[in-house]
Amino acid sequence: MAYYGVAPKHMVKSAFRNLIQWMKDTRVEVKHSNEAVIDGIPRDVFALVLKIVINAIYGKFGFEQGPLYDRLATLQVTVNGQLMLLMLCEELELNNIQVISANTDGLMVKVYEDKKDDFDRIINWWQTTTGMSMDADVLHCLIARDVNNYLAQFRIKNKKTGALELEDEFKGDFNPLMYANDLQKGYSMPIVAEAVYQYFINNVPIMTTLQNSNNILDFCMTQNVGRQFHVEETKVVNGKLQTKVCQRYVRFYVTNNGYTVEKVHNVTGERSRLAAGMQVCVINSLDDADIVSRNINYKYYYNKCYDIINPIKLGITPKGKGKTQIRKKAGMYNRLFDD
């Protein structure tokens, strides 16, 4: 919103606006530069840092303890920005250009060749009318469950050769390295996201990807429970139940011959099983055991993959809503008696 001079009331509006505009212009220049390194910084890193800083400034408008706090500035950016994007969505749809999804700062649009001129005209009109600028990337394919969980492949021109290359972008459950990008997400069986990727992009059967992995960490997940709980393993040894208290942060995988792991409330004794009550094996300390000896429950991971795939291919929700209609349309429901 630098174009409209949005700034915290207690700051010099012109100086603040010029700073934001400089960061925006620099980011666009860096992003489209042919240089791999700019001022000693890799091009992609430079562009990403500027994007994060610009977005962070908006976030600081709403932070009461911060030096940029201004509730009115927050509303000016939010409300006006959304209205401008809605105006663009409306114009595109009125011209039979499908808007696939929209969020706070951008749109995903499906443009056929015969609509390319209309699309360019509408974008130019919108930029002129609002004073905003629009940057676009071309998608090769999009596989999405919702706006927060998707796999996208972008067509990127190689800066040196000029050839088009495909660049992957993952978000949410589709990202095998989600835990590395956001430590709060925890570590959760990266093999699932990898198998889904191979299934959609390279047509590799889910079970093939699962069984080809030799790294037990691909199948592991972690659970960090609050201090009001402790973690217990329960297993059968020589026909008797044995219970052992584990550390609160536990790493485990699902197996065919393991044991149950539960978090137990320290006061009430209330219990809840990890991994939906499946048999698991705790592996807080990594060893060199062969993957075959782990006796991994591949069916569990297979089903987890299809929890992602089915909502996309069958048009149902992640919780399975819509299966009834699918069965009816497929003729899988038969009346007990004829009419």
Segments from the language model and where they lie:
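Conserved acidic
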Residues: 1-339
